């Protein structure tokens, strides 16, 4: 089977958040869909290894923020390539809390071998801004990002060095490409030790 067939499915790019005690936590997700309009119900797929998964299961609450094409790539790095077990991802961003935090109330879940599919009833929501929503395709083709290993759309060949002329440095964590040899990744904030050289020198 050609695993790239899944790249033809339509996905968005979202920040999914919940509570860890009194602290907000969250991660990037791309597998979210509306199930019904009345009552408004959302389905969300999340890897068992994501810390946010256990927080949603524990609190029964979660929120979804739809990222736009103009979203700062650093937001994806912060929420997609670091774990809420180790850092407070909300420390350096502006955010709004509704209903204490959640806009969705967990109503059911289904387990697979690697992921949980959560069903949530939408309690509240709002549209902020008019920029186009970021799709998974846009993230790969324009932002040039790669999927974290916990993403349902992760493909191992994303870790392979890109071919082409000229030496480039690629962040092994998030896939960001840089033409120099001393750098800190603006997406996932990793240092030069996480970059590997690709192409011809």
List the predicted regions and their residue ranges.
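The −1 position to Zn-ligating cysteines in a subset of zinc-ribbon hairpins
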Residues: 170, 184-187
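Basic, polyanion-binding surface patches
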Residues: 1-178
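Extracellular/surface recognition and adhesion modules
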Residues: 178-179, 185
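Short, non-ligating residues that shape and space the ligands of small metal-coordination modules
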Residues: 180-181, 193-197
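Intrinsically disordered, low-complexity terminal tails and linkers in eukaryotic proteins, enriched
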Residues: 200-201
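Cys/His-coordinated zinc-binding microdomains
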Residues: 175, 189-192
């Amino acid at each position: 089977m050609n695993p790239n067939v899944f790249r033809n499915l339509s996905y968005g790019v979202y920040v999914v958040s919940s509570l860890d005690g009194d602290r907000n936590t969250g991660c990037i997700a791309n597998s979210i869909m509306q199930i019904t309009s009345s009552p408004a119900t959302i389905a969300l797929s999340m890897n068992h290894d994501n810390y946010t998964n256990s927080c949603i299961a524990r609190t029964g609450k979660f929120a979804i923020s739809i990222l736009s094409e103009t979203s700062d790539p650093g937001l994806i790095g912060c929420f997609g390539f670091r774990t809420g077990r180790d850092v407070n991802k909300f420390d350096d961003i502006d955010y709004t809390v509704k209903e204490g935090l959640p806009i969705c109330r967990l109503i059911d879940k289904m387990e697979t071998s690697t992921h949980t599919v959560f069903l949530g009833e939408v309690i509240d929501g709002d549209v902020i801004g008019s920029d186009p929503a970021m799709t998974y395709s846009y993230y790969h083709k324009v932002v040039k990002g790669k999927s974290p290993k916990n993403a349902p759309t992760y493909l191992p060949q994303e870790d392979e060095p890109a071919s082409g002329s000229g030496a480039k440095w690629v962040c092994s964590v998030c896939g960001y490409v840089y033409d120099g040899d001393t750098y800190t990744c603006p997406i996932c904030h990793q240092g030069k030790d996480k970059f590997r050289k690709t192409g011809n020198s």
